[in-house]
Amino acid sequence: MRDSPGSKSSSERWHDTMAVSDPTAEGKDESSAKTSGFWALTLGSVGVVFGDIGTSPLYAFREAVDHAAQEGAVTPAIVLGVLSLILWSLFIVVTAKYVLLLLRADNNGEGGTLSLMALGQRALGRRSLLLLALGVVGASMFIGDSMITPAISVLSAVEGLKLAAPRLQDYVVPLTLVILVMLFAVQSRGTARVASAFAPVMALWFLTIAVLGVLHIHEDPHVLLAVNPWYAIHFLLNHGLLGLVIMGLVFLSVTGGEALYADLGHFGRKPIQVAWFCLVLPSLLLNYFGQGALILAHPEAIENTFYRLAPAPLILPLVILATAATVIASQAVITGAYSLIRQGVQLGLLPRFEVRYTSETHAGQIYLPRVNLLLLIGVLLLVLLFRTSSGLASAYGIAVSTTMVADGIMGFVVVWKLWNWHPAAAAALVVPLVVVDMMFFSANLLKLFDGAWVPLLFGIAMVVLIWTWRRGVAILIKKTRRTEVPLLDLIQSLEKRPPHIVKGTAVFLTSDPNFVPTALLHNLKHNKVLHEHNVILTIETAQTPRVGPAERVRMENISEKFSTVSLRFGFMESPNVPKALAIARKLGWQFDIMSTSFFVSRRSLKASAQSGMPAWQDKLFIALSRSANDAIDYFQIPTGRVVEVGTQVII
């Protein structure tokens, strides 16, 4: 926890009470603390950010070369072409676009597709339907990717058993299913206890794959010629449509690149950049070059080039390490999906899903039961449907490439509008990157009927859910607005003919403070009473990840008995009404929680033929509304102080 400005840390206060310290020594201690903290973040990013892209060597190079050979001989031209494509894809897509460009496009320190969408809309100064569509599509495809990443990663690691113990070949799929079920089962307990081991394990993984690559490069040093981009260009020119197909498989080497930006808020730009340039990128390149040299020297190794890098006695330990690395990579993707869904809820794109906190000290450690169950079902179905990592490789990539295209276009808006670049300069920087993304997207479309339809289907389902929810909410607001009463009109009416006044404070939750909350109208109509203090409470979501205490609360007295309070939360925050109201007390709002009642409206929806949506969408919206988490729980309001008022609304 950071100390407030002007305050002293515990170590500084200790020194003040014991002795007068040497200023030079204090400066060195502070510098040392900053340095150690920086390297801790750098190591931490290795354990969380790079799991997906770090496990790509298990299958990416093998699949690309195998398809390029088309059951023929593996030639040096194929190996050098594929290696060059992988190397320059890592340079352009991951290094240039994400590590050097988008990591600078932070939304108050946060990254990710929805964060970039909010940043772009803020830069434009208005809500853009194009940016909203890009954000929704990009986020939805990330959810589709969240299902396929654990499946292909764990399955490709366990497949090493075929080499270590051939008799266990029939147990690869069952063992993969067991590992995945266990992974999703422990989510409800949180990962704080084991998260500290993620970074050392992944650091060991990257060092291991680097060493394995180095040990084989000497078998054919000519693979280093792949640094020349001409080999990539020559390969594409000479292979026509097949070259585009291979690009779809080469893309497997950069999947996970989008995670660098999504995890920006957890570690910061510099630690991620240092980890990438100093450890991750060199390790990946050395391993890919090692696999290339191995295939040129031993073409039969194409069966499983990654595990063939290791001496026979070390294959089983490597399988264990690879499985651990893929589980960590899967964990990072699952956590990212939770975070993305919560952001979507806060931004009004999805209904309120139940959120459980698995750590008392880290607000980001969350668990979403329904999301976890849906992800588990999707992952298990993928494993059972495709059964091999080679089969899943055909399905992998379409969702990630869609997200990357969306990120690129939104990145252009940020560079142009927020950074105030000339449109031509912004286009010169971003358009080439987007063109490369579009090439990969086109290449992955060729895999549509080979399995890419599966994650695409998951992504489209998410788009439909978001579209239905937003459309339904808009229709609901429009219909209820017809019967709502302006708040000022009611106050004037009550001043002329006051009802019976009871002691205490009533807090009415509403989405629009200009109109009378339904719960207040029902209280007056049925109970015929009015509290001596009435607060119209609205909860807003800012276009920034977090909101400082100074911007959290806005209060306004409307009359002697009525006031409005607006609470603002960032889209990365968990709304906590009692804590926010504690800030309001410091600002002068006098209230006693024990004499305060919270009035919440609960709507029961029924469809009508004139709703404006098809019947299937009406039913879907009503189902989503019923499945939404209770507002009382979501906003963490004390249940003992809540009065719920039920109303029926025909949409």
UniProtKB/Swiss-Prot annotation:
<keyword id="KW-0633">Potassium transport</keyword>
<comment type="similarity">
    <text>Belongs to the HAK/KUP transporter (TC 2.A.72) family.</text>
</comment>
<keyword id="KW-1133">Transmembrane helix</keyword>
<keyword id="KW-0472">Membrane</keyword>
<keyword id="KW-1003">Cell membrane</keyword>
<feature type="transmembrane region" description="Helical">
    <location>
        <begin position="129"/>
        <end position="149"/>
    </location>
</feature>
<feature type="transmembrane region" description="Helical">
    <location>
        <begin position="74"/>
        <end position="94"/>
    </location>
</feature>
<keyword id="KW-0769">Symport</keyword>
<keyword id="KW-0997">Cell inner membrane</keyword>
<feature type="transmembrane region" description="Helical">
    <location>
        <begin position="232"/>
        <end position="252"/>
    </location>
</feature>
<keyword id="KW-0813">Transport</keyword>
<feature type="region of interest" description="Disordered">
    <location>
        <begin position="1"/>
        <end position="31"/>
    </location>
</feature>
<keyword id="KW-0406">Ion transport</keyword>
<keyword id="KW-0630">Potassium</keyword>
<feature type="transmembrane region" description="Helical">
    <location>
        <begin position="396"/>
        <end position="416"/>
    </location>
</feature>
<dbReference type="InterPro" id="IPR053951">
    <property type="entry name" value="K_trans_N"/>
</dbReference>
<dbReference type="Pfam" id="PF02705">
    <property type="entry name" value="K_trans"/>
</dbReference>
<feature type="transmembrane region" description="Helical">
    <location>
        <begin position="276"/>
        <end position="296"/>
    </location>
</feature>
<dbReference type="InterPro" id="IPR053952">
    <property type="entry name" value="K_trans_C"/>
</dbReference>
<feature type="transmembrane region" description="Helical">
    <location>
        <begin position="448"/>
        <end position="468"/>
    </location>
</feature>
<dbReference type="GO" id="GO:0015079">
    <property type="term" value="F:potassium ion transmembrane transporter activity"/>
</dbReference>
<protein>
    <recommendedName>
        <fullName>Probable potassium transport system protein Kup</fullName>
    </recommendedName>
</protein>
<comment type="function">
    <text>Transport of potassium into the cell. Likely operates as a K(+):H(+) symporter.</text>
</comment>
<feature type="transmembrane region" description="Helical">
    <location>
        <begin position="423"/>
        <end position="443"/>
    </location>
</feature>
<dbReference type="GO" id="GO:0005886">
    <property type="term" value="C:plasma membrane"/>
</dbReference>
<dbReference type="GO" id="GO:0015293">
    <property type="term" value="F:symporter activity"/>
</dbReference>
<dbReference type="InterPro" id="IPR023051">
    <property type="entry name" value="Kup"/>
</dbReference>
<feature type="transmembrane region" description="Helical">
    <location>
        <begin position="38"/>
        <end position="58"/>
    </location>
</feature>
<keyword id="KW-0812">Transmembrane</keyword>
<feature type="transmembrane region" description="Helical">
    <location>
        <begin position="197"/>
        <end position="217"/>
    </location>
</feature>
<feature type="transmembrane region" description="Helical">
    <location>
        <begin position="309"/>
        <end position="329"/>
    </location>
</feature>
<feature type="transmembrane region" description="Helical">
    <location>
        <begin position="366"/>
        <end position="386"/>
    </location>
</feature>
<feature type="transmembrane region" description="Helical">
    <location>
        <begin position="168"/>
        <end position="188"/>
    </location>
</feature>
<dbReference type="Pfam" id="PF22776">
    <property type="entry name" value="K_trans_C"/>
</dbReference>
<dbReference type="InterPro" id="IPR003855">
    <property type="entry name" value="K+_transporter"/>
</dbReference>
<feature type="compositionally biased region" description="Basic and acidic residues">
    <location>
        <begin position="1"/>
        <end position="16"/>
    </location>
</feature>
